[in-house]
């Protein structure tokens, strides 16, 4: 009887450990080459479950010959030494404007296999725990959408799941694989009811980029990372078959501002016409948009306006975002404060039962790391709620 009791106890403990591991919320940070800054405070690093080094260029994985070096701003070994044991270190491939490598890779069965073999070799050589595929975006609407029309990229919609499947096959089942995916529905060309289930077969999770939801392609003011627009993003993926527990909500550790031409936005600041912000022929920025991370110096020409934004800005309870309209400079400001970050946990993460969160990017929040603290606090709050259930 004693032996049987001990056997049951061991089984119970193993089950408890498995359940705890399975329900641990992901807290993913991108560490970027632009701001490769890691907090010195160990208590800020401890809640981070995954670190994604961004970026490695997609083109290098199309080489026929196996590479002897994998250029990135920080080695996996160095990154691992900075974080708690057990933190998963991933390599992010691609990024905004890096589409040609993916285009080449996805075209044929042979090119997909070559790309996948090289990705697997990189993971093995660097000691990474996995990869994040950041193709912006399969099917079109990327940086080059005026140069290469979407109809010329329509084939990528069916090729994208095939490329992911080939990478997963090469990596094997024990390495992590994620994808950073668009937050704006108009950019979700490759993420349909027909494709999402195929995509999710290859991935451990999706990083939904619920930021930059207002950009130069828009023509009215809105929150660039607001609650309602973020819910629209998450709901779109879930409606097309992505499980909630495989979705990570994106947070932006930076500001955005837009210079509005024409009528004043004083009476109706949200949804106010902005005027043209990109060249209709080339897609180039017309100089009416801007932004900076919390680590960057504030540009001199908007310093005074930004100070007013911090002092007089307000939170929109309906759309769920911090904003300010500067009437004097005709500037629309939109970003998350730590308080705005806190609100997203009950309204989105908890409400939709998401599997985790991520932020772009860790070093962008230096030196105060106020937004990281808010993100960590949200994670810890949800963990306590789960423990009490």
Tell me the role of every PLM-derived stretch.
Residues 93, 251-347, 377-389:
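Glycan-binding loop/region signatures in secreted carbohydrate-active enzymes
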Residues 31-33, 55, 91-95, 135-137, ...:
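A cross-domain feature marking catalytic cores of carbohydrate-active enzymes
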Residues 60-71, 138-297:
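Substrate-binding surface in catalytic domains of secreted glycosidases
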Residues 73-80, 116-123, 157-168, 196, ...:
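Generic structural signal for well-ordered alpha-helices
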Residues 3-4, 12-26, 386-389:
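N-terminal signal peptide
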Residues 51, 91, 133, 167, ...:
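Conserved, mostly hydrophobic/aromatic
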Residues 22-123, 149, 372-374, 380-383:
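Glycan-recognition patch characteristic of GH18 chitinases/ENGases
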Residues 25, 47-49, 85-89, 127-129, ...:
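Short, well-ordered coil/turn segments that N-cap beta-strands
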